[in-house]
Amino acid sequence: MSKQSTGAASAYAACVPHVPFMNIQARDRNAGFWNAYEAQAARLRRFDPELVFVFGADHYEGQHLKSMPTFMIGHAAHAIDDWGGFPGRLDVPMDIARACSEFIVEAEFDVSISYAMVVDHGFSGILHHMLGAVDAKPVVPIFVNALSHPRPKFKRCRQLGDAIGRFAAGLGKRVAFLGSGGLSHDTSDIFPQVFETQNEALRDFLIYGGAKGALTPERWRTELNAGLVEVNKLQEQKTPGVGAAKPEWDEMFLRRLTSEGVGAFDAWDDAEILRTAGNGAGEVREWIAALAAATAAGASRITVEYYEAGSCIGVAAAVVHAQ
């Protein structure tokens, strides 16, 4: 039986990676990670949230460079059937999403909104694994650009999360905040910056999403998936240099996150992170926003439940939670 709302807000947060490889490899290859992940999912289900805010990234499936938002709040959304993702329509409570957008604008954030938001595994993976399905709970999806230059400042991501948390605290509900992505990894060979690639077809797709040029969304996905299958073989064999994490960077981030809080990264320089931890490490913006939101909504201690640099999923495997 679901818990009855007491009218008093309470908050929960979890942050985990969303890399597709974790969904196609046998779970016993990464048993420690999955044990920690499933324990966190069980904890979330016991919390039984009445509302979920999920902070996720996109991999040129829903957002393209013809008009790339820095932040976006989905008022309606569906997840595509991409590699490592789980398709379906998200149960977005439009009235709450709209009220959240209004609150955020009053907080002086000029966010984008979408009534037809398309999300990929960057959102659907965490919803599926944490809650059982992408539509298991009412959810407001928050896109944070972590892939395309220029990315938002870490301070701004924290401030956005803080504002969303203050909005959520006023709802009188049990609210979960999920951060999807990270930690250290590099995907620049797969997702280059548009001004760095000489491949005209790829450049057109990054900008137009298949509306112009030789790459259709179907062909893009087919070719991307084929490449990822080959990379996955190398990762499962633990080929040196393939999918290598940066444990020194990860451990520094997690140590500061738990000891200093989300404000510790306000002055971080994006170029330095790209150099030392890879362009995928920028997805910790989603973690910072989610944990800032949870903190503003009443969560306290941030805890690292699991970390492993040597997994074969292509990123450092970590599970972080706050409540």
For the regions a protein language model found, what residue spans apply to each?
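Beta-strand elements within well-structured catalytic alpha/beta cores of enzymes
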Residues: E50-G56, I142, K173-L183, A290
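Internal active-site segments that recognize and position negatively charged phosphoryl groups
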Residues: G161-R166
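Short catalytic/ligand-binding loop motif for oxyanion handling, primarily in non-cytosolic enzymes
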Residues: Y60-H64, S184-D189, V194-F195
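Short glycine-rich, polar/acidic loop-and-turn segments at beta strand-coil junctions
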Residues: H18-P20, F55-H59
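Flexible, D/E/H-enriched segments
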Residues: M1-P49, L65-Q159, G170, P192-Q323
